[in-house]
UniProtKB/Swiss-Prot annotation:
Biased composition annotated in UniProt, kind: Basic and acidic residues: 677-687
Main localization, broad class: membrane
Gene3D superfamilies xref list: 1.10.287.70
Pfam families assigned to the protein according to its UniProt record, in alphabetical order: Ion_trans_2
Name used for this protein in its record: TWiK family of potassium channels protein 12
Family: Belongs to the two pore domain potassium channel (TC 1.A.1.8) family.
Length: 687
């Protein structure tokens, strides 16, 4: 048991998940307290020591002056001079105690002018609160509370709206700059493409128009505005330096408002406040862009994980395309036991940081999934049903709990709960967890993922945690899965198969591609079959299925093997290609002519291969094979002249038909590729 696992066990023991956010807030507060105390404590102690020494010095000097005034005979007889000396002593005392500024505050004009009152109102609804001026009367304080309660929500809504508007305006300006000659020269052009070389239909024109304003440029604009506003403050407030002005502006736009620095020019308060408001709008825009980017990152990770699940699900059914009958196996033999034994072959020793990365990947994945799920009122009921399903009482079945089902002559006893799963209406009475329509499929996908070699990158760990999440089945039911398409490119133009291009799927730019939709070929259908929970082998390896299927999971057309092969050609037939079609690439010598066999039997071709042949003006190509005892009557294929082929040769030069056909294997069992069937079933057309 590693250190990280011990920490996880302790957190589960004290139920840390219920109040960890509050503990994080307390920890952040303690960190801030330590940080500020570390930098401010010693300096404050020094200031207090100096102030204490100065206070004692002031006391002594003040006492000496009073004694001097009392003992001086001249001052005793001259009252005017005595009052003057006393006033000088009091002014000196006030200056030493730093009380002159406070006295000057009350000696100046009232701050409750129109500009000062507007500045105070702005402090309230922006939640800055500098602490000057302040309301002293009871009526003023009551009005302050009511004004803040109504003004703060309105200002937050306005700030969000102005942030979006500012983002749109800056985005338009950014587009104009990019389209200009200066922008094309200065800013690089980004080309978006998928990894497999095909176009991404999701990257439509509308989504490209919705591309947000770049975050780095927004942050640079915010920094420029902070520096500009700080320089303006330095011009109006003569006692401020540039770092102090930057500090004041950042504290203001973050709505902290410590109040240690205040404006001393009442005439410029409104203009200064407008600078702060625009800074708040820029900061809100940056937060909005960052939040949108995080949301899009979550959506992207979610879509990638869903696509991986779809591909792996298609691989599961692709490896097991046939549904066969088999005698019944044991009932309720804990089907997950063999899966655990097959996947957990060895325990890998992992360090603390690897466990920490797994924990972080799990938390991020939980956040991504939770953001996609809708808040439902029956969440507690689902948790109770899940706990009931995981209880060991489910494995205890009696003979009364079993039903007998038949499928094409194969008889099998299954549990009532498993059989009831074929009907959605009976789902509430079953022992299957709610929303677990993908149970069998997800078990196979998890087994495939665990068999793969583990990678240390964050994306792989996030996908593994994505599959292990308990809410995956529920989110698969609520998510509208996108349509995927398998794309195969064919270079042999003679047997070209052209199908209608799917507008929603991916398609290649160059060449001929035939795509078939694979979406919904692996998804379990409600009311179609019951998941085979009682089968041990099917859950683990996916090589047998005992389901009661009313409709095939995969189209039989794609699962049907062809009875024809590209090697089943008659050796007596010579395929002749017109000479005018054989146009080589400019600057390249023509390919050497091949020597095809004109004999009727491949055995005679082997015995008389030293025979000389007359060169024919037209190149003769014959698919050849070695001698076999199972010769089958083959079809006669002859390629005719086609203008499209001629055009393709002019553009591409050599085509695969210009070379000898690949030699076949010496094995007597010929592998059927379905090539000839595709030529008979599909029309020949050239794109």
């Amino acid at each position: 048991m590693t250190l990280f696992q011990k920490l996880q066990w302790f957190c589960q023991l004290i139920r840390l998940r219920a109040y960890y956010k509050f503990l994080l807030l307390i920890a952040y507060t303690l960190f801030g307290a330590w940080l500020f105390r570390f930098y401010e404590l010693q300096a404050d102690i020094k200031r207090r020591a100096i102030y204490g020494n100065d206070t004692n010095l002031i006391r002594r000097q003040l006492a000496e002056r009073w004694i001097e005034m009392h003992d001086d005979a001249v001052l005793r007889n001259n009252s005017v001079l005595r009052r003057r000396r006393a006033a000088e002593a009091v002014d000196w005392l006030l200056g030493e105690l730093n009380l002159s500024d406070h006295m000057r505050e009350f000696s100046e004009d009232t701050p409750w002018t129109w500009t000062g009152a507007m500045f105070y109102a702005g402090q309230l609804y922006t939640t800055i609160g500098y602490g000057y001026p302040t309301a002293k009367t009871d009526e003023g304080r009551i009005c302050t509370v009511l004004y803040a309660l109504f003004g703060i929500p309105c200002f937050l809504m306005y700030l969000k709206a102005i942030g979006k508007t500012l983002s749109k305006r800056l985005k338009k300006i950014y587009k104009r700059v990019r389209r200009s000659a200066f922008g094309k020269f200065l800013l690089p052009t980004r080309v978006t493409a998928t990894k497999d070389g095909f176009e991404d239909p999701d990257a439509s024109a509308e989504e490209r128009k919705r591309k947000p304003f770049p975050i780095p440029i927004a942050i640079i604009l915010l920094i420029i505005w902070i520096c500009f506003s700080a320089s303006m403050f330095c011009q109006w407030e003569k006692t401020w330096d540039f770092p102090s002005a930057v500090y004041f502006f950042i504290v203001s736009i973050s709505t902290v408002g410590l109040g240690d620095m205040l404006f001393r020019t009442p005439d410029m308060m409104v203009f200064n406040f407008l600078l702060i408001l625009f800074g708040l709008a820029l900061l809100s825009m940056c937060f909005e862009l960052i939040t949108d980017r995080i949301a899009k990152w979550k959506q992207k990770r979610f879509d990638e994980h869903i696509k991986k699940v779809q591909k792996m699900a298609f691989q599961v059914f692709e490896k097991d395309p046939f549904v066969e009958e088999a005698p019944p196996l044991g009932i309720r033999m804990a089907p997950n036991l063999m899966q655990i034994a097959a996947t957990h072959v060895s325990e890998e020793k992992r360090g603390f940081f690897a466990e920490l990365k797994d924990w972080f990947a799990g938390k991020v994945t939980d956040n991504v999934i939770q953001s996609k799920l809708e808040d439902t009122d029956d969440e507690s009921d689902e948790d109770e049903a899940l706990e009931e399903f995981e209880s060991p009482q489910v494995a205890t079945l009696t003979a009364n709990d079993l039903v007998v089902c038949t499928n094409g002559g194969a008889t099998r006893r299954v549990s009532k709960q498993s059989y009831a799963f074929s009907d959605v209406s009976n789902l509430s009475n079953s022992k299957i967890p709610p929303g677990n329509n993908y149970g069998q499929l997800l078990d196979r996908i998890k087994a495939m993922e665990k068999f793969k070699p583990k990678k240390g990158d964050l994306d792989s760990r996030m996908f593994a945690k994505f599959l292990e999440n308990k809410k995956l089945a529920k989110i698969l039911e609520q998510t509208e899965l996108r349509e995927l398409a398998t794309v195969s490119c064919q270079t042999d133009l003679s047997g070209l198969v052209v199908q209608r291009r799917n507008p929603k799927g991916r398609h290649a730019r160059i060449g001929s591609c035939s795509s078939q939709s694979t979406m919904s070929t692996f998804l379990p259908r409600n009311n179609s079959h019951a998941p085979d929970e009682d089968s041990v082998m099917s859950i683990t390896f996916g090589d047998l299925k005992f389901d009661y299927i009313t409709e095939p999971l995969i189209d039989e057309y794609h699962l049907r093997e062809s009875n024809h092969s590209i090697f089943d050609f008659d050796d007596d037939e010579v395929v002749r290609i017109p000479q005018k079609m054989l146009v080589s690439r400019p600057g390249m010598p023509p390919p050497p002519p091949s020597r095809p066999s004109q004999l009727a039997s491949p055995l005679r071709a082997l015995l008389e291969k030293e025979q000389k042949y007359d060169e024919d003006p037209e190149i003769q190509l014959t698919p050849r094979r070695l001698a076999s005892l199972t010769d089958v009557q083959a079809r006669k294929v002859k390629l005719g002249y086609d203008e499209n082929l001629q055009h393709a040769r002019l553009v591409c030069g050599l085509l695969p038909q210009d070379f000898d056909s690949p030699s076949t294997s010496t094995s007597t069992s010929m592998i059927d590729s379905g090539y000839d069937l595709s030529k008979r079933d599909a029309p020949v057309n050239i794109v």
